[in-house]
């Protein structure tokens, strides 16, 4: 059942990333778990800061980040689906993570959660 749920999520989430531009998108998926004692709201707040920085550096409001949280099951595990309009925007986001602001945001993510898996997908609406 767990594998089926993960498969369904990985099939559906890239479509969510296309909701804004209705064509193609680059979607980066992260599989994460909260560290002990950390509340999801802290991750959400840090992710909002990451998204604002990323949109500014990518020069696009078409960058989006989705947090997929558990409805039934282990509430400490979740997924990020970060959608970019193209590889150029994704590369700009990665470069921004090396800035002082980006390093601080990444350090906060490291304090809040552990991410065990990461994939980059190219998606196209059919």
Indicate residue ranges for each PLM-predicted region.
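Positively charged n-region of N-terminal signal peptides that target proteins for export
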Residues: 1-4
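Hydrophobic h-region of N-terminal signal peptides that target proteins for export
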Residues: 9-18
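Cleaved targeting-peptide boundary
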Residues: 18-25
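An amphipathic, aromatic/His-enriched active-site/gating alpha helix that lines ligand/cofactor pockets
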Residues: 22, 46-65, 74, 83-120, ...
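Intrinsic-disorder/low-complexity, polar/charged segments enriched in Ser/Thr/Lys/Arg/Asp/Glu/Gln
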Residues: 25-29, 75-79
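N-terminal targeting signals for Sec/Tat export/insertion, comprising classic cleavable signal peptides
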Residues: 26-57
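Solvent-exposed beta-strand motifs enriched in subsets of small alpha/beta binding domains
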Residues: 32, 81-82
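Beta-strand-rich interaction surfaces with strong enrichment in secreted/lumenal proteins
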Residues: 67-69
């Amino acid at each position: 059942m767990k594998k089926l749920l993960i498969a369904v999520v990985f099939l559906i989430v890239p479509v969510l990333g296309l909701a804004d531009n209705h064509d193609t998108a680059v979607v980066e998926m992260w599989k994460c778990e909260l560290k002990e004692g950390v509340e999801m709201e802290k991750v959400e707040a840090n992710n909002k800061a990451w998204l604002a920085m990323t949109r500014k550096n990518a020069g696009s409001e078409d960058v989006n980040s989705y947090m997929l949280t558990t409805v039934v099951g282990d509430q400490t595990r979740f997924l990020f689906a970060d959608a970019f309009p193209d590889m150029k925007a994704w590369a700009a986001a990665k470069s921004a993570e090396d800035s002082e602001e980006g390093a601080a945001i990444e350090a906060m993510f490291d304090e809040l959660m552990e991410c065990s898996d990461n994939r980059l997908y190219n998606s196209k609406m059919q």
